[in-house]
Amino acid sequence: MADSCCIRLHLLASVFLLLFSSFNLQGIAAENLSKQKLTSLILQNEIVKEVNENPNAGWKAAFNDRFANATVAEFKRLLGVIQTPKTAYLGVPIVRHDLSLKLPKEFDARTAWSHCTSIRRILVGYILNNVLLWSTITLWFWFLLGHCGSCWAFGAVESLSDRFCIKYNLNVSLSANDVIACCGLLCGFGCNGGFPMGAWLYFKYHGVVTQECDPYFDNTGCSHPGCEPTYPTPKCERKCVSRNQLWGESKHYGVGAYRINPDPQDIMAEVYKNGPVEVAFTVYEDFAHYKSGVYKYITGTKIGGHAVKLIGWGTSDDGEDYWLLANQWNRSWGDDGYFKIRRGTNECGIEQSVVAGLPSEKNVFKGITTSDDLLVSSV
């Protein structure tokens, strides 16, 4: 009875989210950009100059190799967070923490839980004979001018992977492909964008398999979203590629799905107590040029919505409070794949869309793999 009730609620939630989001399939800030704008290059000398000559910018801009020759349209396709109306969060709890909790002035999940390799895992992609090969699995990944807007799924699976290690000492990498392909309308539209909260609800109701069970590549070469222009959402297969794993046994579950109260103290307390969280924010043109420092919007057009993993906080030498985040665009982007953004001012909306959930012990102690053989950490 309880299971059937959950299924009905799940279906109602799916229809609800579809009705409230069908008007907008391309990110938090899906701007109607002109054809001329979309075909122009995302990296611009004017933006680099304006940021670097601004004494109050607080960060440095550069031509990141990851976006060399990329157009605005190609960059925009990587921003897969769909705007979710506030009404779609009805029934989703908002977590607040005890304000008396003493928090450190600086915190970095990579050092706080140094035994958890998933927290600091970085991807390195190479092009060989027009085939994208992977040397590691990451912070998520850069589709290299691929066209799958799935940051919403990667932000979720990477954060939950970290939380499994923190709570159960289980170094595991969970499958974004499972979420993108099998979550359905509860999560949104797969490669055409999705809801971060939907992914966490999927973990609760259906669980998510490991990267080893459902990876982003096969023995024939590149088969993950992004290898081809306009790659469609992958088909939900519900079977592991690894012969020694069963789909159901590979599932890892979440306990609940919740939003964190948009107060810096609550967000910091959540990360400090439970591990990294998924955050969504609005991306402008200048963000593609980020190299170092504490980012805040300076110049450029609004492009779309992006989801990343928040792993810590601190204060710069200039006295600027910041959040520390892991992006999905490889080590050649930003500060070795990471970036800092201004904390306490809801910069680009980053403090108002923080979501997470707790890991469940279901299936954890059944002898399933505790590390994916397909993964090689790059730290």
Curated annotation (Swiss-Prot):
It comes from the Eukaryota. It holds the Pfam family Propeptide_C1. GO terms for biological process: defense response; proteolysis. Disulfide bonds join 116-165, 148-191, 182-236, 183-187, 213-240, 222-227. One of its GO terms (molecular function) is cysteine-type endopeptidase activity. Residues 31-102, 363-379 form a propeptide. Its EC number is 3.4.22.-. InterPro entries: Papain-like_cys_pep_sf, Pept_his_AS, Peptidase_C1A, Peptidase_C1A_C, Propeptide_C1A. Keywords: Disulfide bond, Glycoprotein, Hydrolase, Plant defense, Protease, Signal, Thiol protease. Glycans are attached at residues 32, 69, 171, 330. Induction: By dark-induced senescence. Down-regulated by infection with an avirulent strain of the bacterial pathogen Pseudomonase syringae pv. tomato DC3000. The active site is at 151, 306, 327. Residues 1-30 form the signal peptide. Belongs to the peptidase C1 family. Thiol protease that plays a central role in plant programmed cell death (PCD). In addition to its role in protein degradation, may cleave and/or degrade a number of target proteins, activating signaling towards PCD. Contributes to the increase of caspase-3-like activity after UV-C-induced PCD and is required for abiotic stress-induced PCD. Functions redundantly with CATHB2 and CATHB3 in basal defense and distinct forms of plant programmed cell death (PCD). Participates in the establishment of basal resistance against the bacterial pathogen Pseudomonase syringae pv. tomato DC3000. This is Cathepsin B-like protease 1. It comes from Arabidopsis thaliana (Mouse-ear cress). The lineage of its organism: Eukaryota, Viridiplantae, Streptophyta, Embryophyta, Tracheophyta. The gene is CATHB1.
